[in-house]
């Protein structure tokens, strides 16, 4: 209710009561004013009531919510179901226009405002997480998950380069959507095998440079590197890769899917942008901001390239993933976001200690990757630990499966999600996009041992870690 209407209410009830009400509504208006002026995360997150008030106020700016509006066009933001309308807070027009995903819509000032504010909040959150300003000239939040966003990024890079640049040099990462994003963009993936460094699987920089010389600079569009990954693979050497790309004038796209929560990765991205060439780095919204799957953020030091990606997106887009991030960041606030990052870092140390203790008690080994991989762990698997486990042996015989693969299914049946078993005894081969991979899932052809991977990702709790260790212990020691 605006001030004029509140003053009118003084003719209906006591003026002193209305003065109190004016004070209360002024507090809300001040919060909204601060958000609109500063466009940053509030220091303390807003409660759900305040966020809903903000959403309802802004949605009234869209034409489909005008009281006297009539629509005679083909796309008028009509919503049949009341549940659907409630779910979207009345936002029906999506984001962007046919020529640009970030262009403002005449019919949807509210939706356009939400998009603009969300981009500003995301930039603020990324800086708070540890990215330097020089690496963040702009960002683009798209309603597509990471794989499709990577494909659009490479398509855009391809559109501004000569057509003969067909090859993408890709240090092997056994995640299907990464490879498929290259193929979807109509490009040819050139797999760069990794190399072993102790327990770690690492980037082979010499192999990258040799392949550049072999194929020719004029034929290579970019190097497609990866930061966040499952141990024992560790993040690619993106600083050195960026320097190679700068030296040869080759594009560099970084898949930073869930790396936004890791300060070491963000420091390396900032350094790569400063010392070499980085065209864009892409991160997932669900893995970093704890929202439903469906969004990804494109960032980079070159604002013009990010704008070009925006212009290349065909048509309008769904605004739900943008709205999810907007609500979540307002709910977290600056302190909530920083606390989540801090807690994850502390629990990483605790998880490492508990896994090390477990490994010692069960004659296994926690692979030594923590100095480079600050999110994921890998624990060796030895058949000796399961020779007397009647449940696993029985299931293994009945299903004709390998013992190690049964461990993963048994963990899942005990409500432990997210762990992965890499069984190297099976010599698993997989064909993707015409390329055959040996021991798929391990990121390398010849790793020495089977293992179990887990992750210490943002939002994990100490209780989850303790419960996982307990359930894993029962599986190892069940007679």
UniProtKB/Swiss-Prot annotation:
Residues 96-106 are annotated as: Phosphate loop (P-loop). Keywords: Cytoplasm, Protein biosynthesis, Pyridoxal phosphate, RNA-binding, Selenium, Transferase, tRNA-binding. Pathway: Aminoacyl-tRNA biosynthesis; selenocysteinyl-tRNA(Sec) biosynthesis; selenocysteinyl-tRNA(Sec) from L-seryl-tRNA(Sec) (archaeal/eukaryal route): step 2/2. It is found in: Cytoplasm. The record marks 74 as: May act as a substrate filter by repelling compounds with a negatively charged alpha-carboxylate. Converts O-phosphoseryl-tRNA(Sec) to selenocysteinyl-tRNA(Sec) required for selenoprotein biosynthesis. This is O-phosphoseryl-tRNA(Sec) selenium transferase. The lineage of its organism: Eukaryota, Amoebozoa, Evosea, Eumycetozoa, Dictyostelia.
